[in-house]
A protein has these predicted regions:
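Phosphodiester-processing cores and adjacent nucleic acid-binding clamps
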Residues: 1-172
Length: 172
């Protein structure tokens, strides 16, 4: 049906990445995890995405299903990786003042995924007083975006503008 209508689906997942190995589960070291957008650009990528997601549930579950850098590298073929929201590794490290860690992460993802790695810029200015979380997020995004642009230029990583969307309809 998709081919008849010239509709090309893009399969992907916002995954959680363990700070160390997916089989390590110490609360102090492994309780936090990073967000990462993983998209399949072809059939091989789709199969690798399914492997990553499945293994995150069966072998990496600690509070949430998690993958790690080792699994990402092992199943990198056919995947597009995007740095995600302010809970992504690069952005979180920028916001915590760990600029060396942010640079290391960009270099690692660029080395492993090459031109299939993108840094995400997000700008969610929400003026609705009932939308507290987004209102608090905006200044953080602004601060991170400036540094993300610098990192993209320094390491020749493409930038994309995205939204942290999880629902189609606002009332959902």
């Amino acid at each position: 049906a998709a081919r008849k209508r010239l509709f090309k689906p893009i399969f992907g997942c916002e995954m959680y990445v363990a700070p160390r190995r997916l089989d390590q589960m110490e609360k102090e070291k492994d309780g936090r995890r990073y967000h990462l957008i993983v998209l399949a650009k072809n059939e091989t990528g789709y199969h690798n995405l399914v492997k990553l997601v499945s293994k995150s549930w069966t072998d990496g579950f600690y509070v949430r299903p998690r993958t790690d850098r080792f699994e990402l590298e092992a199943h990198r073929e056919g995947l597009i990786i995007c740095s995600a929201c302010i809970a992504g590794e690069v952005t979180r490290k920028i916001l915590s003042g760990d600029l060396e860690g942010a640079e290391e992460a960009v270099q690692w993802y660029k080395r492993v995924f090459g031109d299939n790695y993108y840094l995400e810029l997000q700008r969610h200015e929400v003026k609705d007083p009932d939308q507290r979380a987004n209102r608090e997020t905006f200044p953080l995004q602004q601060r991170a975006n400036a540094r993300l642009i610098e990192l993209a230029r320094k390491y020749d990583v493409k930038l994309i503008c995205t939204n942290d969307c999880h629902f189609v309809e606002q009332e959902d």
